[in-house]
UniProtKB/Swiss-Prot annotation:
Organism, scientific name: Rattus norvegicus
Bias (Polar residues) ranges: 41-55
Binding positions for Na(+) 2 per the UniProt entry: 96, 98, 101, 336, 368
Protein name: Sodium-dependent serotonin transporter
GO molecular function: actin filament binding; antiporter activity; cocaine binding; identical protein binding; integrin binding; monoamine transmembrane transporter activity; monoatomic cation channel activity; neurotransmitter transmembrane transporter activity
Listed result of changing residue 109 to A: Cocaine is effective at blocking transport
Lineage: superkingdom: Eukaryota
Result of changing residue 172 to C: Cocaine is effective at blocking transport
Length: 630
């Protein structure tokens, strides 16, 4: 008897008309023909509903059927899956909870009405952020592909979205890990009996350095600077050696060594796939919560802590009448949860087919939002302490935003606490682990996408491809390691990646809800989970979530941020440069649409129909289909 060798690369299975194919335990969903799409009985994207058969027939229960003869390729062996369910949850939480939760949310909250800001933030999370988060998890888990090849199974004409996501991920890796390098430099500098940013007697200090904690009756002038500020600006960043974007200065060898060390850790954490990264996140995703708990208890016991808490949460309801508050709430929840970056697609693609991604979406979203909220207490109890020590209002202490809030204000507060070295070490180690989680996720999104799209080239060479990606990211980070690197980091964050990712997410939401079809998408979810998403989710996916993204994009275009950093005003040409960098990723979408229409044979109408019709089947493990649909 002839048998198929276990190491064979593929098995060809021919599907007859109006049938789904079952081969080697895998259910193949076929692709409809152009004629079938025109039939009024067809549901979205041309799939026709197949009536349920008897309970004994496990091969098909309300599964959309193929309406054409199809030769489908089935690869031997199953896709890699997470070792444990908790590996996946910790990876998603580690990705969503990043540095922005620690510095951005508390600052935006108090700037936009304190406790009143929680209302628009919650509304935007419920109607915008969480539905998009759930959509990506469901898409990735059902189709089991990265952000490039998944579009062959959804709507091929939008495959450029995947390429755009990969380019954006590279830009983010180029500047985000530089911030982690700053934290690592601080961590190494903290391994002393006395923290170096506590005095004005170091080689990098200037005559304006004033340590108001050292003695009483210190006169603070407009030109006075704190030891922590000079350590950050003149020693770590060496910003005084740069005149701006037009003259970035030399590359810091100290920061270069830090970023090489960081990417070395990243490489050995993700080179073997989710089996290894899923174990690493047990440390990197849980350690920040231990440190946050310690810092929260310590901050609450400091004198003046209550002043900071009141300043953080005191509601200003009049702020809700300002459009900017709602824009900030929408942007914060979107960038915090992180749909549109391809990461959720990649992570979910390694889940088991019947994993409850609906529950996962709710749990991880709530954990992320609560972490942001609690981080505000960690930050503002310390700011209240700083205000008490300076005999100033909390608003005067909380003027720093972004990384400066952590590397200047919070670092200075830690330096003047008892056991300052201990708290400095755990604080900066927490920042590093927060950043590493997000980098693991961002690069895994790219790696999964490329390996799924080019399996014959890279499937058995993952370690080498990961090495290429890591080296490319290190080289891309060189500009941010210069004396003026902080200027580059801010430009990339505000203009090169933010608007681009919003645009990509908007097109993705429209492509899934309007082209692939909300009916078909909900049918897919029902096959996995045994129940169909309710009307709330359908309305959000079809209308509210796209409008949510469009609202942020339009607000950004009408009122783009005026960049200013460390008394440096960005020139107009730099803003144009930022937009151009952002467009270099988004341009992949219309470029691929044009390429697809040109390369597809037939009339224009036939080309369009073929280009929006799924071209490859979705493999569904038959034993994993839920039959208890309600």
């Amino acid at each position: 008897m002839e048998t198929t060798p276990l190491n064979s690369q593929k098995v060809l299975s021919e599907c007859k008309d109006r049938e789904d194919c079952q081969e080697n335990g895998v259910l193949q969903k076929g692709v409809p023909t152009t004629a079938d799409r025109a039939e009024p009985s067809q549901i979205s994207n041309g799939y026709s509903a197949v009536p349920s058969t008897s309970a004994g027939d496990e091969a098909s229960h309300s599964i959309p059927a193929a309406t054409t003869t199809l030769v489908a390729e089935i690869r031997q062996g199953e896709r890699e899956t997470w070792g444990k369910k908790m590996d996946f949850l910790l990876s998603v939480i580690g990705y969503a909870v990043d540095l922005g939760n620690i510095w951005r949310f508390p600052y935006i909250c108090y700037q936009n009405g304190g406790g009143a800001f929680l209302l628009p933030y919650t509304i935007m999370a419920i109607f915008g952020g969480i539905p998009l988060f759930y959509m990506e998890l469901a898409l990735g888990q059902y189709h089991r592909n990265g952000c490039i090849s998944i579009w062959r199974k959804i709507c091929p004409i939008f495959k450029g979205i995947g390429y755009a996501i990969c380019i954006i991920a590279f830009y983010i890796a180029s500047y985000y890990n530089t911030i982690i390098a700053w934290a690592l430099y601080y961590l190494i500098s903290s391994l002393t009996d006395r923290l170096p940013w506590t005095s004005c007697t170091n080689s990098w200090n200037t005559g304006n350095c004033t340590n108001y904690f050292a003695q009483d009756n210190i006169t603070w002038t407009l030109h006075s600077t704190s030891p922590a500020e000079e350590f950050y600006l003149r020693h770590v960043l060496q910003i005084h050696q740069s005149k701006g974007l037009q003259d970035l200065g030399t590359i810091s060898w100290q920061l270069t060594l830090c970023i090489v060390l960081i990417f070395t850790v990243i490489y050995f954490s993700i080179w073997k796939g989710v089996k290894t990264s899923g174990k690493v996140v047990w440390v990197t995703a849980t350690f920040p919560y231990i440190v946050l708990s310690v810092l929260l208890v310590r901050g609450a016991t400091l004198p003046g802590a209550w002043r900071g808490v009141v300043f953080y949460l005191k509601p200003n309801w009049q702020k809700l009448l300002e459009t900017g508050v709602w824009v900030d709430a929408a942007a914060q929840i979107f960038f915090s949860l992180g749909p549109g970056f391809g990461v959720l697609l990649a992570f979910a693609s390694y889940n088991k087919f019947n994993n409850n991604c609906y529950q996962d979406a709710l749990v991880t979203s709530v954990v992320n939002c609560m972490t942001s909220f609690v981080s505000g207490f960690v930050i503002f109890t310390v700011l209240g302490y700083m205000a008490e020590m300076r005999n100033e209002d909390v608003s005067e202490v909380a003027k720093d935003a972004g990384p400066s809030l952590l590397f200047i204000t919070y670092a200075e507060a830690i330096a003047n606490m008892p056991a300052s070295t201990f708290f400095a070490i755990i604080f900066f180690l927490m920042l590093i682990t927060l950043g590493l989680d997000s980098t693991f996720a961002g690069l895994e999104g790219v790696i999964t996408a490329v390996l799924d799209e080019f399996p014959h080239i890279w499937a058995k060479r993952r370690e080498w491809f990961v090495l290429i990606v890591v080296i490319t990211c290190v080289l891309g980070s060189l500009l941010t390691l210069t004396s003026g690197g902080a200027y580059v980091v801010t430009l990339l964050e505000e203009y090169a990646t933010g608007p681009a990712v919003l645009t990509v997410a908007l097109i993705e939401a429209v492509a899934v809800s309007w082209f692939y079809g909300i009916t078909q998408f909900c049918s897919d979810v029902k096959e996995m989970l045994g129940f169909s998403p309710g009307w709330f989710w359908r309305i959000c996916w079809v209308a509210i979530s796209p409008l949510f993204l469009l609202f942020i994009i339009c607000s950004f275009l009408m009122s783009p941020p005026q960049l200013r950093l460390f008394q440096y005003n960005y020139p107009h040409w730099s803003i144009v440069l930022g937009y151009c960098i952002g467009m270099s990723s988004v341009i992949c979408i219309p470029t691929y649409i044009i390429y697809r229409l040109i390369s597809t044979p037939g009339t224009l109408k036939e080309r369009i129909i073929k280009s929006i019709t799924p071209e490859t089947p979705t493999e569904i493990p038959c034993g994993d289909i839920r039959m208890n649909a309600v």
